Amino acid sequence: MAITMREMLEAGVHFGHQTRFWNPKMAPFIFGHRNKIHIINLEKSLPMFQEAAKFASQVSARRGTVLMVGTKRQARETVALEAQRAGVPYVDQRWLGGMLTNFKTVKTSIKRLKDMKIQQEAGLDSLSKKEQLMFARELAKLERDIGGIQDMTVLPDAIFVIDVGFHKIAIAEAKKLGIPLIAVVDTNHSPEGIDYIIPGNDDSSKAVILYARGIADAIIEGRSNAVDDVVKAVVAESSDEFVEVNETAA
């Protein structure tokens, strides 16, 4: 579903941070200020959001993966829910250093998590109460840290981040590996190095929901379009195999 200017206004996307905390590199996206609060220019934010969503859709259409990241309190639940709805990996609790740059090691942890789940389903009766407690603690920690990426077998094709200041390590890792970045950037942070900037409030829960929902919708749409294209191609190929023969009466 396309995001509208009205929705952005109602979600408070235009409210930036206090003017004394601003980052001058965000000046092109600032409309002005009111009561010492910077006001973000939604006439610039909206098309940039649409461009970011279009990119996410294109990645999904070519069967790529968009990793959704939002570990700050007001983003956690929303990011997890929207990522699950879109069927993509996510990080909603904390970013582990090396999650991308040391993905080989992370995959070992993912295997451990999956093995433990299988073991749990089979039953833990063979373990002592102390061992069961230690098992439960390790499983809970792995689930919390990497549960959202347990089905991510390769590095993502793009990363969507809410609040660049809060996720500096994730952004640095993505840049190092050349993974395209889609990110919400508020007035107190620099947009440098972000491939698809969404200038906007990164603290409002309503705004966070709008961003995450918009990107998730784009991912779902892209995947749907890809399926439609495959179906059309199959139908066209099948049609070519049959040649109509007009019989003339003898």
UniProtKB/Swiss-Prot annotation:
One of its GO terms (molecular function) is structural constituent of ribosome. Pfam families: Ribosomal_S2. Keywords: Ribonucleoprotein, Ribosomal protein. One of its GO terms (biological process) is translation. PROSITE patterns: RIBOSOMAL_S2_1. GO terms for cellular component: cytosolic small ribosomal subunit. It comes from the Bacteria. Belongs to the universal ribosomal protein uS2 family. This is Small ribosomal subunit protein uS2.
